[in-house]
């Protein structure tokens, strides 16, 4: 596979739908390539390889692509649905901590900040945000299995995702009033985060 030929702008069907093509630029070609061909060690003309992109997003693109018949369209659906669900979970999280009025503003700012359009493109950002907010949402409710599970999905979405393990661990210890005698076996659920990274490295 010659990655130098991966399109800067991702083609869709039919070609006349340029209003869809604008949502497929920059890294979209890499995600489409992984969704179609998975990972390999072939470098493009600039020395780049597709294993620099983490697998959860293109994996979901491939799965949904079997249903809708087009990986690019599936990427658009995943990104926009993840964005909407992420906003919903953000509202629940902030509402629980600071009230519904603050939650309304948080979601409004999420939709209106200048680069929010990225969440609608064929990039992994919206999926990353959904999984990250979900991890904190469940951590705040002391549901550590789900918090760790979504933390693991964060680590499978982007390279920086593994660092969510630090605030999750802090929240866990805070919930236990930083008393080591109160630590229970559920702390092991946080191991899903490095496990997610380890699965990709294998």
Regions found by a protein language model. Give the residues of each.
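Specific aromatic-rich, kink-prone transmembrane helix
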Residues: 89-92, 109-112, 118, 127-146, ...
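Juxtamembrane/transmembrane-helix boundary motifs at the membrane-water interface
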Residues: 1-19, 42-46, 66-70
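Transmembrane-helix signature of polytopic, membrane-embedded enzymes
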Residues: 70-74, 90-112
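Short hydrophobic/aromatic helix or loop-helix immediately within or flanking a transmembrane segment
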Residues: 22-41, 46-69
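Membrane-lumen/periplasm interface segments of specific transmembrane helices
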Residues: 1-5, 23, 153-154, 161-202
């Amino acid at each position: 596979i010659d990655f130098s030929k991966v399109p800067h702008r991702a083609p869709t069907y039919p070609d006349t739908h340029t209003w869809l093509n604008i949502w497929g630029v920059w890294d979209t070609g890499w995600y489409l390539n992984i969704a179609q061909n998975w990972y390999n060690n072939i470098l493009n003309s600039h020395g780049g390889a597709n294993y620099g992109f983490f697998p959860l997003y293109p994996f979901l693109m491939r799965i949904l692509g079997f249903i809708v018949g087009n990986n690019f369209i599936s990427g658009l659906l995943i990104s926009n649905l993840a964005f909407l669900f992420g906003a919903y979970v953000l509202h629940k999280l902030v509402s629980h901590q600071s009230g519904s009025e603050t939650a309304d503003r948080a979601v409004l700012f999420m939709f209106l900040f200048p680069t929010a359009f990225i969440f609608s493109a064929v990039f992994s950002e919206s999926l990353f945000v959904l999984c990250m907010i979900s991890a904190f949402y469940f951590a705040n409710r002391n549901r550590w299995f789900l918090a760790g599970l979504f933390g693991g999905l964060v680590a499978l979405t982007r390279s920086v995702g593994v660092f969510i393990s630090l605030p999750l661990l802090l929240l866990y210890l805070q919930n236990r009033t930083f008393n080591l005698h109160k630590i229970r076996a559920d702390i092991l659920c946080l191991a899903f985060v490095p496990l997610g990274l380890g699965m990709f490295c294998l």
